[in-house]
Amino acid sequence: MNKSVVTNKGTVEGIEKGGYVVFKGIPYAKAPVGELRWKAPQELDAWEGTYKADTFQNMCMQELPKAEHPFMGRFHKEFYNNPEFVPGMGEDCLYLNIWVPEHEEGERLPVAFWIHGGGFGGGYSSELEFDGEAFCKKGVILVTINYRVNIFGFFAHPWLDAENERHISGNYGILDQIAALKWVANNIENFGGDSKNITVFGQSAGSMSTQVLCSSKLTGDIPAKAIMQSGISCDADVLYTPTLKEEEEIGERFIGLTGKTSLEELRAMSTEELFEAKVKLDDEMWKTGRGLVVVPNADGYVLEKTVKDVWKEGTMKDIPYMCGVVTDDLGATPEEVKAGKTGILMEECKRWAATREEKGTPAYLYHFAHELPGDDWGTFHSSELWYTFGTLGRCWRPMEQQDYDLSEEMVTCWTNFMKTGDPNGETQIQEEKEKWESYTKENPYVKIFK
């Protein structure tokens, strides 16, 4: 296996593992610090020599879940309790990681491009539950990325509009994702990947980001397929993309909390000062019942229209899709799903699939209903991630053989879809497995993982 690869900016050297090579912490854009804070990602300068891609780099600035928090404490216990998988933090954070399976020279492997969740306020590319080994065993390259989040990634304000040639602001985190996706499209063939077979997938805010990328003209024809896990917006009010004007109103509130009177003063603020104002803004928004508000916006450029309008017009990318939920996303049991009684997020998935049927491209729907072993929490938001990445061995829970069997089935379905656009693949996992049909009005099939 070749652990040294030449990219368009220089040579990178990864770490050889059993059957694959992992490249950790490859920069895909300049560090967005100083004058580059709240600007679109800037192209890297070329480097000389070999970049040692052997360490996961900084996560982007965020407030990590605390163990004592009444709600987020459960996420700390589940995903953030191992210091080995919690890297440093800083504004210098635009890095990606690549897991490459052993392959023949000249072979072009399918590529999975993962966008983490975290409510557009947190999360990072090297979380405990993310790893590419299981995908590599199936012959798929995995890429995971960092992107700016919270006030660093989605702050919109007229001051920022004024310095932008398109008079827009706020979508820096999405522009990071697009820059990373284009970096992959431009470089992945040197790693053995197929630049024409890239599947964009994500969970929660990462799923919503996937919908944005599939609704934006800036991504062109790069995404060949997409998977949206627990986060899609068609007609309901649960998830939304505000207009630029609406997001600028949030920005005005944030400015008031900082006490600053110019963009220069804002860029001179320390991360600690910015976070203090951000926490105040979050508290204010939650008290008024508005919840998550520092999010991507329809600025007329990154998103010409809101994702809901794009869905209504049917102008999202015309590619195969997979989308689904876990039980606690929607408050419905598997029995209710079979009886046609589903919650909001599953209804959104069905609306999306109906639009795909009209366009003649498939959409595959699923419901993850497996109760995780352990003394708490059941089938919770994000619980499927251990299974889709095949990382059960890292989890604190007393996993049993049925958990490993379910994970094997899900990894196989996900990677089959990434290869061919069909989760069933060329061969079934087991002869007795029921075929996963695409969703149509005549056959509203939802695959249940339990």
Spans of features found by a protein language model:
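Short, solvent-exposed turn/loop segments enriched in Gly/Ser/Thr/Pro and often Arg
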Residues: 148-150, 201-205, 367-375, 429-437
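Non-catalytic accessory segments of hydrolases
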Residues: 1-171, 195, 288, 401-410, ...
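C-terminal domain-tail junction helix/linker
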Residues: 431-450
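Serine-hydrolase-like catalytic core of hydrolytic proteins
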Residues: 79-260, 311-330, 358-361
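A structural signal for well-ordered alpha-helical segments within the folded catalytic domains
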Residues: 21, 91-94, 175-178, 182, ...
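Bulky hydrophobic/aromatic "packing anchor" residues in well-ordered structure
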Residues: 28, 47, 385-387, 447
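Short, flexible loop/turn segments with low-complexity composition
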Residues: 264-269, 426-435
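Substrate-gating cap/lid region and adjacent catalytic-acid/histidine neighborhood
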Residues: 225, 233-240, 257, 261, ...
